[in-house]
């Protein structure tokens, strides 16, 4: 028997109810995910996974594709019930017929069970075939009035472990404005107004990770005041980002070249935030000037 049970979520429900958004949400929560897995392959897949991966959280989308679907999935569920190494839940996504029709018309896609092309007929047949599975589901979510963002938040609230470090993490990075803004930054702060160590010959070839540069940057009164205000701004808003279901928050601090001031500020910020949150720090342009000089 495995020391740690596999936590399996089977994502199913009405076509057009949001299974694609759901599986992306599970991926953000640290689950290993697979979309559109035939029910008959689930047991074989789980046999391969047991003991071969460090990730004990799996989410599989299982879709209705034929009239034999329920019989197939029922056999799978019976097998899972007998497996002591797996804890599983079924997440069933539903929505009102009118909303499902509107979504299909918006995407101009055909319903997989609409043999004659009529969307509503396909929806009615699918609802009839899925009714027994819906009754077996531990989690039923009606997405009729939910935006994709709200669905992500709902899934995060129901399935994320608050102690799980995968649920929300912070990326703090430094950069140089002369090399362009980071495309993935959520929050950007500019420290170009602070005294620049570049103009001190003894500091020019060092970076904000070196003590001499760090002390030079931080020992100015305006630096300390700005840093305290920056930390005071960021810390209170982090729970809000987590509550909204955001998986990664990228905070970027920039100076002219990304070697001195921004590096010192970003690293200090990362170290302080890491006292209460999972944080990773990086310095995009820290060595760019050195590399340019060496090539010339």
Swiss-Prot record:
Q: Does the keyword ATP-binding apply?
A: yes
Residues that coordinate or bind ATP? 13-20
Provide the residue span(s) of the region labelled Disordered: 277-296
Q: Which GO terms describe its molecular function?
A: ATP binding; GTP binding
Q: Where would one find coiled-coil regions in this protein?
A: none
Q: Which UniProt keywords apply?
A: ATP-binding, GTP-binding, Nucleotide-binding
| Pfam families linked to this entry | PapZ_C, RapZ-like_N
Xref: HAMAP family: RapZ_like
For this protein, the record's NCBIfam families field holds:
PRK05416.1
Can you name this protein?
Nucleotide-binding protein SSA_0810
Origin organism of this chain?
Streptococcus sanguinis (strain SK36)
